[in-house]
């Protein structure tokens, strides 16, 4: 029996995933709804992390703290071992989360009114963060090729030429789970360099390589253009630690670092909570065996979902290269998004994410989180099937 086969009760724990569905979906009562929507896992974090946090809690004093040298070194070691990426400790800046890091990058490295480029369908904060900070969002959608979303570099260059100042890259891609290859990444860098555009690379899903694919950090292949890149990463998605709220930016350019440090201080994010250093260090030094067991478990869940759901006429399932999020294509059914979401909630008692949350390019798709026990996945599949059995 796998450690991931256990089902842990999460209702009534102030879990966004389990306890906020009434608010998110506009329901009076969601007690019978199975949540397979937001991207956190239903698995316990590595035992080493829990033990380290418990030991820290037993100290009983929770004063101001800072990121330990051991924790910083664990980041360097993790990136070297996991991604063959060699970074300097001095390049690391800490933040309360990757979304907060994205916001700090926008505020520190662009000016109000500047244009920020994104490539939808993509993670919703890519739309919201620049706009809420007074920047203009320019969209250059990915295009479909052989059932996958890819870059249209002719359109991408045309967009960059519109006086764009920053590009936000999702690497690996969310929601599609694509692992961008070296040629794609190098072309992104080349074109951004041509138009003097900085690149903010969200790489929070980097460790979640499902079927043996290799994550390529953008900065690793950027060559002489490395200083135009800020890489945003965290252990939180990898080890199910979102509530700990710790992330880091890797910034090789000293001028950008100083600007980001100033914004960190100005926004009151100069220090992390006292558990952040402990959790990060334990995860990166002792969490690898847990992760290595997790990835094939998620892969098996994905294979099961694809096999079962594609028995429904008009449903196509894309298994991602990365993440634990499945992208479901229902466009052949000719159903409106509102209708299929209502059916899923009312008939299937199942909460998934609508594709348009990731931009209009996501219309006709659903996102399903399969980072849960196989029994829960089977339950979710049966609920999905029930919707189309009537």
What is each residue range found by the language model?
Residues 35-40, 54-72:
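A glycine-/small-polar-enriched, mobile loop at the entrance of the PLP active site in fold-type I
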Residues 63-96:
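Conserved N-terminal alpha-helix of the aminotransferase class I/II PLP-enzyme fold
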């Amino acid at each position: 029996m796998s450690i991931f086969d256990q089902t842990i009760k999460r209702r009534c724990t102030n879990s966004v995933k389990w306890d906020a569905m009434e608010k998110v979906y506009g329901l009076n009562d969601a007690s019978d709804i199975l949540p397979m929507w937001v991207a956190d896992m239903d698995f316990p974090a590595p035992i080493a992390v829990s033990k380290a946090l418990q030991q820290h809690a037993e100290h009983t004093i929770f004063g101001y703290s800072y990121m330990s040298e051991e924790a910083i070194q664990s980041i360097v070691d993790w990136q070297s071992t996991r991604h063959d990426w060699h970074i300097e400790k001095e390049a690391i800046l800490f933040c309360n989360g990757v979304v907060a890091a994205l916001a700090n990058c926008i505020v520190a490295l662009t000016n109000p009114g500047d244009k920020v480029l994104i490539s939808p369908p993509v993670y919703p904060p890519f739309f919201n963060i620049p706009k809420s900070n007074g920047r203009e969002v320019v969209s250059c959608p990915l295009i479909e090729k052989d059932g996958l979303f890819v870059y249209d570099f002719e359109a991408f260059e045309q967009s960059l030429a519109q006086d764009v100042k920053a590009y936000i890259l999702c690497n690996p891609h969310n929601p599609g789970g694509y692992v961008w290859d070296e040629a794609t990444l190098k072309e992104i860098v080349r074109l951004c360099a041509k138009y003097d555009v900085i690149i903010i690379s969200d790489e929070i899903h980097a460790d979640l390589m499902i079927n043996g694919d290799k994550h390529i950090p953008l900065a690793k292949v950027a060559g002489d253009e490395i200083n135009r890149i800020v890489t945003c990463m965290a252990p939180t998605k990898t080890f199910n630690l979102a509530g700990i709220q710790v992330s880091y930016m890797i910034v090789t350019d000293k001028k950008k670092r100083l600007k980001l440090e100033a914004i960190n201080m100005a926004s009151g994010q100069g220090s992390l909570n006292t558990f952040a250093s402990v959790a990060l260090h334990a995860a990166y030094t002792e969490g690898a065996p847990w992760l290595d067991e997790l990835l094939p478990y998620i892969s098996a869940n994905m294979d099961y979902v694809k096999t079962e759901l594609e028995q429904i006429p008009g449903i196509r399932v894309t298994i991602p290269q990365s993440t634990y999020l499945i992208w479901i294509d229902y466009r052949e059914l000719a159903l409106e998004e509102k209708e299929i979401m209502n059916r899923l909630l009312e008939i299937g008692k199942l909460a998934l994410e609508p594709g348009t949350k990731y931009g209009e390019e996501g219309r006709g798709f659903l996102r399903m989180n399969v980072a849960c026990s196989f029994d829960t996945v089977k339950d979710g599949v049966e609920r999905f099937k029930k919707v189309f059995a009537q």
